Amino acid sequence: MVVNCFETCRAIDFWNRRNQLNFPGIVRLEHHQVILKPFNGTWENSEKPENQRKNRYNIRCWDHNRVILKSGSGSTSNYIHANYVDGFEDDKKFIITQGPMEETCNDFWKAVWQNNCSIIVMLTPTKGTNGEELCYQYWSLNEDSNIITEDFVIETVNTSVRPTYILTTLRITDKISNDSRRISHYQYTEWPVDETPTNHVDFIKFIKIININRKKSGSNYQQQLLSPIVVHCSDGVKKTGIFCAVDISLNQLVLRKTVSLAKTAEKIRQQRHSTISTPDDYLILQPGYYVLLYLLYKILAIIKIKNCGEKKSRRKST
């Protein structure tokens, strides 16, 4: 029986859990407790007949924190399958959404524009292994070319292929005001469809890159409050939920030296329907935590060695 799985624990205590017998079984029992946690949310907007065609899959979208679009170009619909999700001590850090469809491409860019977003994280290829569409090609792959939607022109400025992701700089222009903004589009390429990230260390490094550039972007635009990061995969729940959970845990670990996996999973599920919905989703998080803890202890060890060296130098000088 798992006891107090929703309590926050010290990083060292979480680290020691790896030595427990039947560790995967314990994790699955924890996930079962997360799933059983009641939450009285509604999803009426996602099931309206006029909105169902905007849902890529038959997945609900919470009403209480959904992204509400402003009308434009004669459209009266304010619906997009997207929710605001909090980071660690960072309200509305993310906008989690599904992979855009051709029909919802303008809505996707409207959400980006209206929320002043400067970073998009894409965790899926556009096509599956059998050629099925997982995500519409909502930007141009060619530099100095663009796509045009009802409200926006999206130009591809440049593309840089990195070992684990592709960084594309985009320029979005509002067709009415003619105002433009730059968007950094990060497509992570080391997460195969229906599998786990190829390398947990690379995945964590990718998340750190996103966080660093979000802060830089806020400084460039002199924003007091950083704008949300748009995160999507294909269904907008599985990979995106894991991405946000690891990001939250990384920041909690660095800032508080504590871990609360069950609480994190519970909160994400209350803000984005169907996230971390299977025991395997929950289990995927565990190796990532161990890598985080390992890296943290390496950093602390380096700092400790450095401090000891400085103390010895002072003694010699005196």
UniProtKB/Swiss-Prot annotation:
It holds the Pfam family Y_phosphatase. InterPro entries: Prot-tyrosine_phosphatase-like, Protein-Tyr_Phosphatase, PTP_cat, Tyr_Pase_cat, Tyr_Pase_dom. The gene is N3. PROSITE patterns: TYR_PHOSPHATASE_2, TYR_PHOSPHATASE_PTP. Its EC number is 3.1.3.48. This is Probable tyrosine phosphatase protein N1. Keywords: Hydrolase, Protein phosphatase. Belongs to the protein-tyrosine phosphatase family. It catalyses: O-phospho-L-tyrosyl-[protein] + H2O = L-tyrosyl-[protein] + phosphate. It is an enzyme of class 3 (hydrolase). One of its GO terms (molecular function) is protein tyrosine phosphatase activity. SUPFAM superfamilies: (Phosphotyrosine protein) phosphatases II (SSF52799). It comes from the Viruses. The active site is at residue 233.
